[in-house]
From Swiss-Prot:
<feature type="domain" description="CBS 2">
    <location>
        <begin position="340"/>
        <end position="397"/>
    </location>
</feature>
<dbReference type="GO" id="GO:0005524">
    <property type="term" value="F:ATP binding"/>
</dbReference>
<comment type="function">
    <text>Involved in a multicomponent binding-protein-dependent transport system for glycine betaine. Probably responsible for energy coupling to the transport system.</text>
</comment>
<keyword id="KW-0129">CBS domain</keyword>
<dbReference type="Pfam" id="PF00571">
    <property type="entry name" value="CBS"/>
</dbReference>
<dbReference type="InterPro" id="IPR003593">
    <property type="entry name" value="AAA+_ATPase"/>
</dbReference>
<keyword id="KW-1278">Translocase</keyword>
<dbReference type="InterPro" id="IPR000644">
    <property type="entry name" value="CBS_dom"/>
</dbReference>
<keyword id="KW-0813">Transport</keyword>
<comment type="similarity">
    <text>Belongs to the ABC transporter superfamily.</text>
</comment>
<feature type="domain" description="ABC transporter">
    <location>
        <begin position="5"/>
        <end position="265"/>
    </location>
</feature>
<keyword id="KW-0029">Amino-acid transport</keyword>
<keyword id="KW-0547">Nucleotide-binding</keyword>
<keyword id="KW-0677">Repeat</keyword>
<dbReference type="Pfam" id="PF00005">
    <property type="entry name" value="ABC_tran"/>
</dbReference>
<dbReference type="InterPro" id="IPR051921">
    <property type="entry name" value="ABC_osmolyte_uptake_ATP-bind"/>
</dbReference>
<dbReference type="GO" id="GO:0031460">
    <property type="term" value="P:glycine betaine transport"/>
</dbReference>
Length: 408
């Protein structure tokens, strides 16, 4: 994917003694000491990263980490102290007021935590507000607003007022209003934080559905790690105005960059994050369109296994061949496809470990990991699933758990 946003050495210091504060932060002095000695606050310091087009990029950190400041620097709601903000190779940090206004109106839209709806305007009028300030003709803006509301399943409520809607529905209106402008970039600041957990999850689902349809570039600020892991393609974790690590959820969980990140993610429920693709192992296969029983048995002996995944010439998954079945087929002069087990569990690469557990628990054979076209991508065994859930797994622990399950 092409790079949509590129940030170079972006810094924001609030206060008057900026040079002194910069010198102190360069020496590694903590944020609270800089504030105490200079009265200046380090918002963001020397930040560098790229965001790809069509990516959901989540910025997270504790309160005061600089995540919301960083978001507002992107559209210059907060002016940077130094650094560059490239959007499609144009440095937004150097734009004059008029050009910046056009970027805010046409390239970016923002969704806030507090909804930001006008109480005296109907839902439709709220949704078309951004188009109205752009002087879009009334008929066109109404059509675009209605389409955005329809995409958010809110068209039936277009003539109601914000106070008549629940918090979740009001936030959906805010999202519809942002999308009505057809922006290339969505900036979302703690957009779902004020919602109840169930409604928040529904909004996350809706955002992912809209993203699948429209493929916007989304920068999403959150303090909720589970939310970030659920919706983010990549995550940036901040502390004291600095980015500690950028990576996928899997990268951050399995390879934290430092002790701070390790502590930050240690309580996350790994079963809700890790997928089959992360823990599958290469599949040992036999091609049932080519291999006979003797070839299958030779492969099993070489690999020291008692079964093989059965695939056809196209490598589409067909079942499992055990050593007993292959021996019987050789004795009776049968092809493998006549004796193999076809009732074998399959999972997608994207399936979460928490959803895999009940499937693999009683499965008589390993699970096949397949793509949307049925092509075999790997295999899951019970041990690999258990290992994925362990904080610090070792082979002895996995074997012990497996024995306990077998004895139940």
């Amino acid at each position: 994917m092409p790079v949509k946003i590129k940030i170079e050495h972006l810094t924001k210091i609030f206060g008057k003694r900026i040079k002194t504060a910069l010198t102190m932060v360069e020496k590694g002095e903590p944020k609270n000491e800089i504030l105490k000695k200079t009265g200046a606050t380090v918002g963001v310091y020397d930040t560098n990263f790229e965001i790809n087009e069509g990516e959901i990029f989540v910025i997270m950190g504790l309160s005061g980490s600089g995540k919301s400041t960083l978001l507002r620097l992107l559209n210059r709601l907060i002016e940077p102290t130094s650094g560059k903000i490239f959007i499609d190779n144009q440095d937004v940090a150097t734009l004059n007021k008029e050009d910046l206004l056009q970027v805010r109106r046409k390239t970016m839209s923002m969704v806030f935590q507090n909804f930001g709806l006008f109480p005296h305007r109907t839902i439709l009028e709220n949704t078309e507000y951004g188009l109205e300030v752009q002087n879009v003709p009334k008929e066109e803006r109404r059509k675009r607003a209605e389409k955005a509301l329809d995409n958010a399943n809110l068209l039936d409520f277009k003539d109601q007022y914000p106070k008549q809607l629940s918090g979740g529905m009001q936030q959906r209106v805010g999202l519809a209003r942002a999308l009505a402008n057809d922006p290339e970039i969505l900036l979302m600041d703690e957009a779902f934080s004020a919602l109840d957990p169930l409604i928040r999850r529904e909004m996350q689902d809706e955002l992912l559905e809209l993203q699948a349809k429209f493929q916007k570039t989304i920068i999403f600020v959150s303090h909720d790690l589970n939310e970030a892991l659920r919706i983010g393609d990549r995550i940036a974790i901040m502390k004291d105005g600095k980015i500690m690590q950028i990576g996928t959820g899997e990268e951050i969980l399995t390879n934290p960059a430092n002790d701070y990140v390790k502590t930050f993610v240690e309580d996350v429920d790994r079963a809700k994050v890790i997928t089959a693709e992360n823990i599958m192992i290469p599949a040992l296969t036999t091609n049932i369109d080519v291999d006979g029983p003797s070839v299958a048995l030779k492969k099993m002996k070489t690999e020291e296994v008692s079964s093989l995944m059965a695939v056809d010439k196209k490598r589409q998954f067909r079942g499992v061949v055990t050593s007993e079945q292959a021996i019987a087929a050789r004795k009776n002069n049968q092809p493998l496809k006549d004796v193999m087990t076809t009732d074998v569990g399959t999972v997608s690469k994207e399936m979460l470990v928490r959803d895999i557990l009940p499937i693999i628990y009683d499965a008589p054979t390993p699970l096949a990991v397949v793509d949307d076209n049925g092509f075999l991508k790997g295999v899951l065994i019970r041990g690999s699933v258990l290992e994925a859930l362990a904080d610090i797994p070792d082979e002895d622990e996995v074997e012990e758990i497996e024995k306990e399950e077998e004895n139940k």
